[in-house]
């Protein structure tokens, strides 16, 4: 059955079927191949796209801008100080105004309710570039990367997410894994595991797709036979005062070479959505080292630079998967 996503918003992977997600992944692969061959795209010719950012970004902003330009669209960027959204103008009114000017809208910010309100009132496709609850565009990039590096269908992949598993990445990876029938393990301290309602909802989805959702605080159990170990920063945007608490909670969950070896899988891959605190080459990294004596946090520099690491392929794939979302929905 053909997949048609025209006019659809992209707010969370919960809204999409396995077939629709696979369609976006296949389209991403095709668009990536065309870019590599130097084929100029025209799928978004004459389209106007607005990017609304409450939170700072490198990969998401660049991926949306380059993807849109690659396919012929025009882009307007509005940062946190460039619009009146939520300050002098309601989110609903902003959505209605921008919907008259633009063909598509991306939002990256704090509340999931904001992107949902924009989608409800804009009358155009709205894409979630990250909220505190979900980060769905990242998951498409992650799954495309797995398809490129692991010689298995997604529904045969064993995936371990290690660290703060109740953040937007933990939530979104669990949703995506359930949809695609994967063996997903959230490996974290009990207090940082995903919350019950979403877990039960995704276990029901996994029961239909042949997937499995496991929550554990046991690292050895969680990473055994894993094809993928994935981690993220220990402190999300807006939680910068939590470093001391998170370091105490998560240091036993740092991805190091011992953890890689504990998978028993010499061909496993390491993934991270970036940015990563793996060395002392950042201001924050230096501050953490001075205060807590750590040279790295969620992943060691050894693992980050090892043959197992595919983080920069993963980062590149943000471009191709975001392009696929825009092409498919506009």
Curated annotation (Swiss-Prot):
Domain of life: Bacteria
EC number of the protein: 2.1.3.3
GO biological process: arginine biosynthetic process via ornithine; citrulline biosynthetic process; L-arginine biosynthetic process
GO function term, MF aspect, one: amino acid binding
Residues the entry annotates as binding L-ornithine: 168, 232, 236-237
Reaction catalysed by this enzyme: carbamoyl phosphate + L-ornithine = L-citrulline + phosphate + H(+)
Pathway: Amino-acid biosynthesis; L-arginine biosynthesis; L-arginine from L-ornithine and carbamoyl phosphate: step 1/3
Short name of any one Pfam family annotated for the protein: OTCace_N
SUPFAM superfamilies for the chain: Aspartate/ornithine carbamoyltransferase
Subcellular location: Cytoplasm
Keyword flag Cytoplasm: yes
Cellular component per GO, a single term: cytoplasm
Binding positions for carbamoyl phosphate per the UniProt entry: 57-60, 84, 108, 135-138, 273-274, 318
InterPro entries: Asp/Orn_carbamoyltranf_P-bd (IPR006132), Asp/Orn_carbamoylTrfase (IPR006130), Asp/Orn_carbamoylTrfase_sf (IPR036901), Asp_carbamoyltransf_Asp/Orn-bd (IPR006131), Orn/put_carbamltrans (IPR002292), OTCase_ArgI (IPR024904)
This protein's UniProt keywords: Amino-acid biosynthesis, Arginine biosynthesis, Cytoplasm, Transferase
Function of the molecule: Reversibly catalyzes the transfer of the carbamoyl group from carbamoyl phosphate (CP) to the N(epsilon) atom of ornithine (ORN) to produce L-citrulline.
Family, as annotated: Belongs to the aspartate/ornithine carbamoyltransferase superfamily. OTCase family.
Protein name: Ornithine carbamoyltransferase
Organism: Alkaliphilus metalliredigens (strain QYMF)
Taxonomic placement: Bacteria, Bacillati, Bacillota, Clostridia, Peptostreptococcales
Gene designation per UniProt: argF
């Amino acid at each position: 059955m053909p997949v048609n996503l025209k006019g659809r918003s992209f707010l969370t992977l919960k809204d999409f079927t396995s077939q629709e997600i696979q369609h976006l992944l296949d389209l991403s692969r095709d668009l990536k191949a065309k870019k590599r061959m130097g084929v100029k795209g025209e799928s978004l010719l004459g389209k106007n796209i607005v990017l609304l950012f409450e939170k700072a970004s490198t990969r998401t902003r660049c991926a949306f801008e380059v993807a849109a330009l690659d396919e012929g669209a025009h882009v307007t960027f509005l940062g946190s100080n460039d619009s009146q959204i939520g300050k002098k103008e309601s989110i609903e009114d902003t959505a209605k105004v921008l919907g008259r000017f633009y063909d598509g809208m991306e939002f990256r910010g704090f509340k999931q309710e904001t992107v949902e309100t924009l989608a409800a009132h804009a009358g155009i496709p709205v894409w979630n570039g990250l909220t505190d609850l979900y980060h769905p565009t990242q998951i498409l990039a992650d799954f495309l990367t797995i398809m490129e590096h692991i010689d298995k269908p997604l529904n045969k992949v064993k995936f371990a997410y290690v660290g703060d598993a109740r953040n937007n990445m933990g939530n979104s990876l669990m949703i995506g894994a359930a949809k695609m029938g994967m063996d997903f393990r959230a490996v974290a301290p009990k207090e940082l595991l995903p919350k019950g309602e979403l877990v039960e909802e995704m276990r029901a989805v996994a029961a239909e797709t042949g997937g499995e959702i496991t929550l554990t605080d046991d690292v050895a159990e969680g990473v055994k036979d894993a094809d993928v170990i994935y981690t993220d920063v220990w402190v999300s945007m807006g939680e910068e005062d939590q470093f001391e608490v998170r370091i105490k909670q998560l240091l036993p969950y740092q991805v190091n070479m011992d953890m890689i070896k504990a998978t028993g899988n010499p061909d496993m891959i390491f993934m991270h959505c970036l940015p990563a605190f793996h060395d002392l080459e950042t201001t924050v990294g230096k501050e953490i080292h001075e205060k807590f004596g750590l040279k790295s946090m969620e992943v060691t520099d050894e693992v980050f630079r090892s043959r197992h690491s595919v983080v920069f392929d993963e980062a590149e794939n943000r471009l191709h998967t975001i392009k696929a979302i825009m092409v498919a929905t506009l």
